[in-house]
Amino acid sequence: RRQRWIIDVQQHLSAILLVNYPRDMKRGEKRPAILACHGHGVHGKEPVMGNDSSPALRQDIAAHNYNYGQVMAEQGFITYAIDWIGFGERNDNNKPNHRPQSGRDWCNIYYLHATMLGMTSISINVAHGKAATDVVCKLPGVDEKRLGVMGLSGGGTMTLWMALCDKRFKAAEIMCYSDLWAAFGIRDINYCGMQVAPGLFKLMDLPDVQGLIAPRPLLIDIGVHDTCFKVDTAMECYRQVEKIYRAAGVTENLELDLHAGEHGWGGNKSEAFFKKHLSF
């Protein structure tokens, strides 16, 4: 069962919120809810939440095992998602009187706009994700004390920052966003404006940022054949995060899904992970 809401994410700005309810929910029952963060792609939240109404959407889902917002709802969780700025229904190409971006990435354009106002794309998206979570926590059937967050690639970035900035999330799954800055940032130039903040990597590397989630439970997905975040440096990132969890005395709260696929959701441990840590 899918609901589509129009919500205010800040003053004078609205977004579409999708909510998937499990079919077996009973009246008056409370279930854990998971924020399903989408990554790059013109369709935004739609394939993640199971919209397969066009060949392009079906191709997105097949390429990245991308419909985790649908699958997790089928496994009993309430799931929800919004479009981050510049994606899906919030893509400027869909707005009246838009100006073509001449082939430039909307992520980078929005980052430039945000920095001129003293903000970043990450901070804006986190604020909008928190606003969506505020709404979801008031919906019938949602147990606001059992929230999780998960996402692939750019959605992995957002999963990381949502977990860090909103302690309501009790468990997180970061998919195909593990690496070292020298590798994905400098060697591969595999990042965009929705994934960075000024001066961040003078202070710490990506494993350090992921380690800040400790002691809360964290599941990391790494694709052996991922061409975006290469497995060698992705695993080095994981090993450094593992050291942080060991130092915190919570090694049991860190899990790895090292799957044989490319840049996509492994899906091998997600159900058990969230059911364990969201008490379901």
How would you name each of these model-derived features?
Residues R1-A33:
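N-terminal cap/lid segment of alpha/beta-hydrolase-fold proteins
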Residues E29, C37-A127, C137-K138, F184-R187:
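Cap/lid segment of the alpha/beta-hydrolase catalytic domain
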Residues N108-M116, I124, A131-A132, F169-Q210, ...:
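Mobile cap/lid helix-loop segments that gate and shape the active-site cleft of serine hydrolases
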Residues P140-S153:
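Alpha/beta-hydrolase fold nucleophile elbow
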Residues G151-A163:
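Glycine-rich nucleophile elbow surrounding the catalytic serine of serine-hydrolase chemistry
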Residues I213, I220-I222:
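Short beta-strand/loop motif that positions the catalytic acidic residue
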Residues V224-D232, H263-W265:
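Acidic catalytic loop of the alpha/beta-hydrolase fold
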Residues R239, Y245-F280:
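C-terminal catalytic histidine-bearing segment of alpha/beta-hydrolase fold enzymes
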